[in-house]
């Protein structure tokens, strides 16, 4: 252990009504940066909010080498993945989800009347790779309303 002084980073607060749009976006999954390189001195972490409107379903995408942890803050959602996005996980308020690196997926809101809000964290950053011309299966979704 050394007694050499080290430069400490500053603590900071990002106000909810001042959050910037995150650099990586996907249609119908609007990301806002909370703790990020755009708003703080953080290195190797992105933490923000993701909004999906009533009945909306995102385009297919993945997050490169980033590991993603999500928390359903408000509403009910689903994530589709796997071959032709035929596998589905359902989530409700208070649930956590892990999305491994490079896994293509689609996020959706299970309600046609309420907004879905996720709290999402990624390491090392908010990497978003949108996937075009994907073969997406037509499956039944268990909407809540």
Predicted regions mapped to residue ranges:
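Short, well-structured hydrophobic secondary-structure segments
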Residues: 50-58
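Ligand-binding loop in jelly-roll beta-barrel domains
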Residues: 92-93, 101-128
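A short, N-terminal "cap"/entry segment at the start of jelly-roll beta-barrel domains
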Residues: 1-44, 59, 131-145
């Amino acid at each position: 252990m050394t007694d050499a002084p080290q430069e400490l980073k500053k603590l900071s607060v990002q106000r909810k009504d001042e959050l910037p749009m995150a650099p990586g976006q996907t249609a119908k999954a609007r990301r806002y940066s909370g703790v990020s390189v755009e708003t703080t001195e953080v290195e190797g972490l992105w933490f923000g909010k993701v909004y999906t409107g009533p009945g909306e379903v995102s385009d297919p995408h993945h997050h490169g080498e980033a590991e993603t942890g999500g928390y359903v803050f408000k509403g009910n959602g689903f994530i589709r993945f796997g071959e032709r996005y035929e596998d589905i996980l359902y989530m409700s308020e208070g649930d956590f989800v892990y999305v491994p690196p490079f896994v293509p997926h689609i996020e959706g809101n299970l309600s046609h009347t309420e907004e879905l809000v996720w709290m999402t964290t990624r390491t090392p950053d908010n990497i978003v790779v949108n996937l075009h011309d994907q073969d997406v299966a037509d499956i039944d979704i268990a909407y809540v309303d």
